[in-house]
From Swiss-Prot:
It catalyses: uridine(2552) in 23S rRNA + S-adenosyl-L-methionine = 2'-O-methyluridine(2552) in 23S rRNA + S-adenosyl-L-homocysteine + H(+). Belongs to the class I-like SAM-binding methyltransferase superfamily. RNA methyltransferase RlmE family. It is found in: Cytoplasm. GO terms for cellular component: cytoplasm. It comes from the Bacteria. S-adenosyl-L-methionine binds at residues 64, 66, 84, 100, 125. The active site is at 165 (proton acceptor). Its main location: cytoplasm. This is Ribosomal RNA large subunit methyltransferase E. Its EC number is 2.1.1.166. Specifically methylates the uridine in position 2552 of 23S rRNA at the 2'-O position of the ribose in the fully assembled 50S ribosomal subunit. It is an enzyme of class 2 (transferase). GO terms for molecular function: rRNA (uridine-2'-O-)-methyltransferase activity.
Length: 210
């Protein structure tokens, strides 16, 4: 490992363990599985797009922070369906499927499972395994964002919403244009709990067109 990479890794570790959100995760492990919980909470607090009785699909759900948050918001009358290529410990009232959404067969399976259900919201915190090469990482991240958009086109009911992680970069504006085609309102969110120097943003698209 180069000195530059080692220095960068040490800086990240130092920031990670000093992070106030990470500290809160360690204090509330039974309720909050990762700092991603706070990102969804920030966005929900400002936009109130998750409501009682809704059906929510969580893409890239593991370790379960967003699913756990969503299931409390939709209540007993709602439902949460989650999927990830990694395993996820069970969460009460959350249906979980393990598989790679990039795999066409698994994507089609999820689509078929959802096609007769009225899906109100899709949330996606999917991100690729970062290589450290900016362009490669950006393209892989945008591909995952596009998969979430594709799923929303397939299964979201009229007026539904999509919350999807994305990253600023060369293909970002083109992706935003694609989102505008499907949704009447598109908002770019940078939660307080998202690290300031990160290119990570969240796109909240509402008013699914039919």
């Amino acid at each position: 490992m180069s000195k530059k990479r080692s220095s960068s890794s040490n800086r990240w570790l130092n920031e990670h363990f000093k992070d106030k959100y990470v500290k809160q995760v360690h204090k509330n492990k039974s309720d909050i599985r990762s700092r991603a919980w706070f990102k969804l909470d920030d966005i929900q607090s400002s936009n109130n797009f998750l409501k009682v009785g809704m059906t929510v699909v969580d893409l890239g759900s593991s370790p379960g922070s967003w699913s756990g948050y969503a299931v409390k918001r939709v209540g007993k009358k709602g439902r949460v369906i989650a999927c990830d290529m990694r395993p996820m410990l069970p969460i009460k009232d959350v249906v979980f499927f393990q598989g790679n959404i990039k795999n066409k067969c698994f994507f089609n399976f999820i689509e078929t499972y959802l096609c007769h259900k009225k899906v109100h919201v899709i949330i996606s915190d999917m991100a690729p395994n970062m290589t450290g090469h900016y362009f490669i990482d950006h393209i892989q991240a945008i591909l995952l964002s596009k998969l979430a958009l594709k799923m929303s086109i397939k299964v979201l009911s009229k007026g539904g919403s999509l919350l999807v992680k994305s990253f600023y970069g060369q293909e970002f504006n083109s992706f935003i244009q694609d989102v505008h085609v499907t949704f009447s309102k598109v908002k770019i969110c940078k939660p307080n709990s998202s690290r300031a120097r990160s290119r990570e943003v969240y796109i909240l698209a509402s008013g699914r067109k039919m």
